[in-house]
Amino acid sequence: MRPPPFNPEIRRALRIDVSAALLFAVFASVTTPFIGLILRRELGATPLQLSVMSAAGGACLLLSLAWARALGGRPPLPYLVWPSFVARGLFLLAPLASSAWSLVSLVVAANVFGAAAGPAQAAVVERLYPRAARGRALGLVRMAGAALGIGLALAAGQLFERVDYRVIFPGAAVLGMAASLRQRHLPVPAAAGAGEPTVGGLRQAWAAVRDDDVFRRLLVASFLFGAGCWIQTPAHPLLLVDVLHVSAAQVGVFAATAAAATLVGSAWWGGLVDRRSSLDALWMMYLVGAATPAICALAWDPWVLVASSVTDALVGVGLDLVWMVVVIDIAGPARAAQYVAIGATLAGVRGILGPLLGGLLIGALGVRAVYLMAVALMTAAAWLVVREPARRAVVYSGSW
């Protein structure tokens, strides 16, 4: 059955959201895929420095409950726009990052402000897009960015072979900041009724987890899957540079392939969460995620990583889209920001421990052992979601 067309309010929001996504795609395409490569190849970052950067990025998420509490019942849009504006603007300082530690510090600072926008993003999405169209709307936004990212990634790979990152990153920062400013025009409705309640602190978060059996079980699965993701982070630059000797041009090809996969995945995941239980989409996403470390563990040639780029991109857009819809479905409008903050806080815990554990595994058993451990953790997460009793229900906000 063909889904109904978007109403005028959704179309208006999509015009703004898509234009912001296009600007952000330029920023992301010439920064994120190349940070690890620059740190290892050009600045000689050690496994310890790579682990510290990843763990610090996770530690930033520990502040999620504080950010959600600061949001409270206030309009969420400013809490989305301005932290992301600062996070992207920090890349203007790239010309000052002449050592591994200085670039690591810049990335960590950007992660602090980026994490601050997480709870507000969930609140904006919940208000902006009705549940029946939420998956398709978010998928369309991601598709727009991915379509532009295909060509950008290929060009960026060649650009980094010719131009210093200290020149490229500030230019990207300007466009990233413009994307944040564009989001200021999103027509976010006011909260229904008296507005969203105060999120509270750790005690209220513990009460929410204790009282919601479904959410608690999904947090366990999410923790296993996320741990599998995080332990890989210090291994990726080492696999690229030391094991497979990947060039910047090849990284550009991988990123372009990932953008193409994101284009397809955005449409598929978005349609799936609107047609079926969002938990069905979640376990499928977790299984696809387990394929990425499996491919990396077996990779014998740089071009094998094209396949892992596809699966990693499918999971990346799935984590962004499917998990947000799952949490909003479970929480309902009043608790969406709190539930997102709880999930992000636990992501911070595994984000600290995962990279450090990954670094220890690399030292003891080698790079590929990390990927085998990740496969086991991520497969276990998928199994837990498959066994979830609530999975068979078609989930809509407030249905539990």
Q: What is each residue range found by the language model?
A:
Residues 116-129, 318-332:
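Intracellular juxtamembrane helix-capping segments at the cytosolic ends
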Residues 173-192, 381-389:
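C-terminal membrane-cytosol helix-exit motif in multi-pass small-molecule transporters
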Residues 37, 41, 69, 73, ...:
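Transmembrane alpha-helix termini and helix-breaking/packing motifs in multi-pass membrane transporters
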Residues 2-62, 214-254:
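Helix-loop boundary and gating motifs at the non-cytosolic
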Residues 78-93, 170-173, 280-295, 372-375:
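Structural signature of the two symmetry-related core transmembrane helices
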Residues 94-107, 297-309:
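Helix-loop junctions at membrane interfaces in 12-TM secondary transporters
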Residues 1-11, 188-220, 400:
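Juxtamembrane intracellular "pre-TM" segments in multi-pass secondary transporters
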Residues 63-76, 160, 264-277, 362:
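Helix-to-loop junctions at the C-terminal end of transmembrane segments
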